[in-house]
Every structure is written in C-alpha cells, then in structure tokens.
C-alpha cells in the first residue's frame, strides 16, 4: 500500500507465484518491473525503490535478498569462495561492481556483475536432516520442491515460509574440469590433507605419521618438493603391533614459506579448511580430500548388504567443511555428533558410496579396501534415501496409462533416483501422458538432491550480502542451496484498481490448487487499459491497445 513502507520484491513475487501463478518467477518479476517504469507506463502502478532499469535498456536489478558472509558461492571448475570475500572490505549498504563467473541453478557458468553489502539484518539458518546449512534473511528465496495441487514442482520459497519437513533443492552437479591442476598446488593440497588428519605443526616442530608405507612415502616426497627442508624419518612398532612411519622436523623455517603454515598451532577441535583450498580447482580439492580420508577416514561393510564410508573429527567446522566439499563433487553425505564426542561425516547410500571412489576416493591402501567391499556386494537394490518426494504418487495418479501399466507403476519403486538411473527408460514406457513424462524426467535428471528441512532457527542480526546475476532467474549457489534481488509498493492509482474488492463488488473463484480465492476481474475505478495500453499475443495474432488521453 502507498502509505506503508516498501516490501521486498522477492516477497511479492513469491506470494504471487505461490497463490496465482505456479509457472516460474521470471514473468512475474518482469511484469512488476514494467509497472514501475514511467517510460513503460504513462501512469505507473508500482512505486519501485532501487534499480528498475532505464530507458536506455539498462536492465533492472535482481530481487534483493541476502545471505551471511560465510556462505560459499560456487564458481566454475570446482572453485568456491565466501560471498563476503568477493569484494574484501565492502562497506555496509553499498553496491560494488564485480566481474565474476558463478554457477547457476543448473551448474552452468554465468556472469555476476555486482555485490551488494546490505548491512546488518535479522537472519535465520535453514538446516537439513543431513546437516547442510545456509543462513540468510527472512526474505531470502531458496529453491524448494513443493507439492502444487499434487504436482511436485520446483518453486522459490522465502526462508520465512520454509518449515521443517519442507524439501529444499541442493545442487550436486560434479564440477567441470579443464586439464590437470598445478603440480605445486596439488602437492600442497596433499600435505594439507595429510597434516590435518595425522600431523601437527607448531612454532618449533612439525610431524606426520601413518601406517601405510606407500602413502607415507608419497607424503614425504611431497614434503620434500614443497618445503624442501631437512627432516627425519623413522619407524616404530605401536601397541597394536603395526609398524608406524613418522616424518619429523625441528626446523620449520622453510615450512613457514608454504601455505601449510596456516595450520600452525591449530587445536584439533578448531581445525577447518583454509580459504585457499576453497579457491582451488576441483583437481586440487580432490587430492586434499583423498589425503584427509586416508588419514581419518574409513570404510566398512555393514549388515544387510550396506556400506559406510565415514570421516571422523573432533572439529565441528572441519566436519561441515568436509561435507560441503563432498557436495561440490556431487557426493551426498550425512553429518552428526557421535556419542563419543566426535563429529562424523558418513556416506551410507549405495549409489553415493559408488560415486565416492569415482569422484574422490581414498589416497592410499583404503581405496583398495573400498574397491574390494563394493565388488563383493550384490548389485544395487535400487532403493535409498535419494528420491523425489511425491513423484510416485503424482505419476500413478496422472499417468493416463492402460490398467496394465498402472498396475506396473503401483508395484514398482518409481521415485528413487537409483531406480531411474538404472531403469528410467522402462519406467517412462509405462507412462502415457507426455506432460507427466516431462515432469518426471526433469525431476530425476540428478542435478538436485531433495533434502528434507530439519529446522529453521533464529541466528540473530548479522551482516548480509547478495549478488546480481545476469540471468532470467538471477540464481546462484550458496552452500549448495539454490539462491534466487529490489523493493516495491503499489501506487495510489493501483489502489484505485483494487478499491472495494473485498466488498463483494466482483466474483471470486478458487485458485489453481483450491487453497485460496482469486477475483475473476478487478473493480478498476482507474481505467488502466485505456490509460496505459497493452500489447501481447492472442490466439494466432498480435494485439495492441494504444494508450488514450
């Protein structure tokens, strides 16, 4: 309303899409922008605040939304960075021009041309059942899987509208890689992973120990190549009877010249992945994770033909970082606090356990052990937690198939991704309706993991940031969540189009899903069509109504 403060455009678009137009936000936002432009309408219906474009075809800003500075933005080739580090030292309530390539909702590189530091605002953290987290303002939109009249649909929901047991979409397309990584960076990544898991670095000495001689030799050679300082190597038999290989040095002068020095004096409970590793390409991160898992990781065969790959640490931040980096490679894991006081990152789904060695793997003998476990297990049974909620019910209800095909669809598991990867063509052959086939194919192509929301919690007032992305939906990835930026309110003339609408002046009918009512026409005391004109495509013809004085 004109007498009230401006509202976030994201909120208006989300409410319109949720109540009246479940077909994407782009057309809604484009309409809102046009109604705020005095060069597009003789009498604008929206009072916009912010960048709504210009007569010279300067595009409008995206709908403003905000996440906290620690959110990791995905970049091409497996790189990522904190959104607060895009423009170091950006002032609160500032717009900063940038030239940055980020990944969109499909995992494709797109241009981001501006960083917004939106000041300090109240924030909320969305946490999934697996442990994935993102923190943002109440009006920050995330891509969610929503049941729209029985149809599972990808829609934007504001954080304030997200509740436990909702489903958010996590982007998990493996990164595109361009050639081998820099040799020196790779060796530093190997050392970092090895020393975080099984080493120590202090002001006066550094050391690393491992039972696998071949892996130990690889780490020692990497140390010589990167650090190049004098070090000692010795072996000793430990209590278990195994032979432990140890690298030790009391001269850390050369070590201080490498990026390994960043973990100096770090307590085990305070360990984390340094920022330079997040900025590294996928090939470097892979070597880091291989060393990390070879040290404190494990794999084991479990009852009922199941498997578990896990990483244990006493550092909550390191567990979060490991889970996030696994997601960057498309591997879904679960993070939790074990009764013993350790944080565990575990991979238990068969498909994810098979993906782990393909995308990452262990750095030494544990990789051979994992290969043996997988080879000894029967073929994947096709059922795990990786599924599309509501898809099976939707297909069975709307497939429009013969009774024999309907019976087949009711008997078989048709909402789990493992089944679609293996038998997708067979499932589609039993679905007659082409629209149902299209929806099912789109939701099961593997781009997204549909994670159940466990909680939405108050995280207090924090500095928040946003990016302007040059695409139709303005989407980019933050901690794997798909994030979707302006403020607006109605003008007095627009209120004349709505006056007395709640006094039975027009007829109302149910909306598309029957949850709310929508008017068949607006009262419109202000003759908008005559004053502002309109243009569009009718049935097979173009129509234009010019504005009149």
From Swiss-Prot:
What the entry lists under PROSITE patterns is as follows: INTEIN_C_TER, INTEIN_ENDONUCLEASE, INTEIN_N_TER, TOPO_IIA
The answer to whether keyword Cytoplasm applies is yes
Task: Name the principal localization, coarsely classed.
Answer: cytoplasm
Q: Where is the active site?
A: 65 (o-(5'-phospho-dna)-tyrosine intermediate)
How does the record describe its quaternary structure?
Heterotetramer, composed of two GyrA and two GyrB chains. In the heterotetramer, GyrA contains the active site tyrosine that forms a transient covalent intermediate with DNA, while GyrB binds cofactors and catalyzes ATP hydrolysis.
Post-translational modifications: This protein undergoes a protein self splicing that involves a post-translational excision of the intervening region (intein) followed by peptide ligation.
Query: Is the keyword DNA-binding in the record?
Result: yes
EC number in record: 5.6.2.2
Give a short account of what the protein does. Answer: A type II topoisomerase that negatively supercoils closed circular double-stranded (ds) DNA in an ATP-dependent manner to modulate DNA topology and maintain chromosomes in an underwound state. Negative supercoiling favors strand separation, and DNA replication, transcription, recombination and repair, all of which involve strand separation. Also able to catalyze the interconversion of other topological isomers of dsDNA rings, including catenanes and knotted rings. Type II topoisomerases break and join 2 DNA strands simultaneously in an ATP-dependent manner.
What is the official name of this protein in its record? DNA gyrase subunit A
Membership in a protein family: Belongs to the type II topoisomerase GyrA/ParC subunit family.
Segments forming domain DOD-type homing endonuclease: 191-331
The coding gene here is gyrA
Provide any one GO MF term from the record.
Answer: DNA binding
Q: Which organism is it from?
A: Mycobacterium kansasii
Where is the protein found, in the record's own terms?
A: Cytoplasm
Which residue ranges does the record assign to the Topo IIA-type catalytic domain? 1-549
One GO cellular component assignment for this chain's record is: DNA topoisomerase type II (double strand cut, ATP-hydrolyzing) complex
UniProt-listed NCBIfam families: intein_Cterm (TIGR01443), intein_Nterm (TIGR01445)
């Amino acid at each position: 309303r004109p007498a009230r403060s401006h509202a976030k455009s994201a909120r208006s678009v989300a409410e319109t899409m949720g109540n009246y137009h479940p077909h994407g936000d782009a057309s809604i936002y484009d309409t809102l922008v046009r109604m705020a432009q005095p060069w597009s309408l003789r009498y604008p219906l929206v009072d916009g605040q912010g960048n709504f474009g210009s007569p010279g075809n300067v595009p409008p800003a995206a709908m403003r939304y905000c996440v906290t500075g620690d959110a990791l933005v995905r970049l091409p080739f497996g790189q990522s960075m904190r959104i607060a580090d895009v423009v170091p030292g950006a002032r609160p309530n500032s717009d900063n021009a940038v030239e940055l390539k980020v990944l969109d909702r499909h995992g494709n590189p797109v241009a981001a041309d501006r960083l917004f530091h939106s000041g300090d605002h109240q924030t909320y953290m969305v946490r999934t059942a697996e442990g994935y987290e993102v923190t943002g303002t109440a009006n920050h939109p995330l891509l969610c899987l929503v049941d729209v009249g029985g149809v599972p649909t990808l829609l934007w929901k504001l954080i304030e509208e997200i509740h436990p047991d909702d489903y958010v979409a996590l982007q998990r397309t493996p990164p595109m890689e361009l050639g081998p990584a820099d040799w020196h960076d790779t060796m530093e990544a190997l050392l970092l992973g090895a020393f975080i898991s099984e080493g120590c670095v202090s002001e006066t000495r550094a050391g690393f120990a491992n039972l696998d001689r071949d892996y130990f030799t690889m780490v020692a050679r990497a140390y010589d190549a990167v650090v190049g300082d004098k070090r000692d190597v010795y072996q000793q038999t430990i209590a278990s009877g195994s032979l432990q290989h140890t690298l030790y040095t009391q001269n850390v002068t050369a070590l201080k010249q490498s990026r390994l020095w960043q973990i100096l004096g770090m307590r085990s409970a305070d360990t984390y992945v340094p920022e330079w590793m997040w900025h590294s390409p996928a090939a470097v991160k892979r070597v880091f994770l291989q060393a990390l898992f070879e040290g404190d990781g494990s794999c084991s065969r479990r009852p009922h033909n199941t498997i578990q790959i896990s990483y244990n640490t006493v550092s909550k931040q390191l567990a979060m970082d490991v889970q996030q980096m696994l997601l960057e490679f498309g591997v879904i894991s679960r993070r939790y606090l074990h009764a013993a006081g350790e944080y565990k990152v575990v991979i238990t789904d068969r498909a994810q356990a098979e993906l782990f060695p393909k995308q990452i793997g262990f750095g030494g003998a544990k990789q051979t052990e994992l290969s043996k476990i997988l080879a000894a297990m029967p073929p994947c049974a096709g059922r795990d937690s990786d599924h599309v909620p509501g898809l099976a019910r939707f297909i069975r209800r709307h497939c429009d198939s013969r009774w024999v095909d309907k019976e087949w669809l009711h008997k078989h598991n048709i909402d789990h991704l493992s089944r679609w990867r293996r038998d997708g063509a067979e499932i589609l052959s039993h679905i007659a309706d082409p629209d149902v086939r299209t929806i099912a194919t789109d939701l099961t192509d593997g781009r997204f993991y549909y994670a159940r929301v466990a909680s939405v919690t108050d995280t207090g007032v924090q500095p928040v940031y946003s990016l302007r992305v040059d695409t139709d939906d303005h989407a980019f990835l933050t901690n794997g969540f798909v994030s979707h930026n302006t403020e607006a309110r109605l003008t007095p003339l627009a209120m004349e189009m709505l006056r007395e609408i709640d006094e039975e002046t027009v007829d109302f009918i149910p909306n598309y899903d029957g949850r709310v009512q929508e008017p068949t026409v607006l009262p419109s005391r202000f003759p908008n069509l005559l004053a502002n004109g309109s243009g569009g495509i009718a049935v097979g013809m173009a129509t234009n109504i010019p504005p009149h004085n």
